[in-house]
Design a protein with these regions (language model features):
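Transcription initiation cofactors for RNA polymerase, centered on bacterial
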Residues: 1-206
Length: 206
């Protein structure tokens, strides 16, 4: 049973790492954490793995390089996803080779983000805290806005309804720009991530 619990925890951690490093908002969250480290709003030993316990200064000296790495990865993710979205939108004009190339570009950008996470040496617990934050600040507002948009679309047109619908759509577009994937893929991916995260937490409590 103990082996089974350890295996479930390992599977959850691996899946959480993989799935959280697919989103376009993830590099920004990592940069926010680096800012907190630099401003001493977060304890070093809570954020960074034991590898740097005896060499904190060396890690802090790398902060500018880490930020540049994350900015590059964020740009790469956004550009790759924009290219894929454009081809999918004009699928009739796109060749299978172009689509495969764009999909590969997105996958490569996500692989680069996963590698960036490893280079940052953040603890697993910190990654899970960021998942909680994304759940509160991105996922829940997103599905709430989607549901409200559906409700308003079914109502009769009025000044109040039209104004609220326009505001909801504007806020949804702002959130969509942070995802790095289609809304449907985001919901599916985040829900899978969240379920995996909870399985790992439940296994640890046993």
């Amino acid at each position: 049973q103990e082996v089974d619990i350890c295996q479930r925890i390992e599977e959850s951690e691996a899946k959480t790492k993989d799935m959280f490093n697919r989103f376009a908002f993830t590099p920004g969250m990592y940069m926010g954490l680096l800012d907190k480290l630099e401003g001493m709003q977060e304890r070093f030993d809570r954020v960074v793995t034991d590898k740097f316990d005896d060499n904190r200064d060396a890690y802090m000296e790398q902060l500018p390089a880490f930020r540049k790495m994350l900015q590059n990865v964020a740009q790469r993710l956004n550009e790759a996803q924009a290219k894929l979205a454009e081809l999918q939108k004009n699928r009739k004009k796109a060749t299978p080779q172009q689509l495969r190339g764009a999909e590969k570009g997105v996958q490569n950008a996500r692989n680069a983000l996963r590698q960036a996470f490893l280079d940052l040496n953040f603890k697993q617990k910190v990654l899970e805290t960021l998942c909680d934050e994304a759940h509160e600040t991105i996922y829940l507002p997103f599905i709430t806005l989607q549901e409200r948009q559906r409700q308003l679309a079914g109502e009769r047109s009025s000044k109040r309804r039209d104004a609220e619908l326009a505001e909801v759509r504007e806020n949804l577009e702002k959130l969509k720009s942070k995802l790095g994937m289609s809304p449907d893929e985001f919901r599916k991916t985040f829900e899978e991530l969240w379920a995996s995260l909870q399985r790992g937490r439940e296994a640890r409590e046993k």
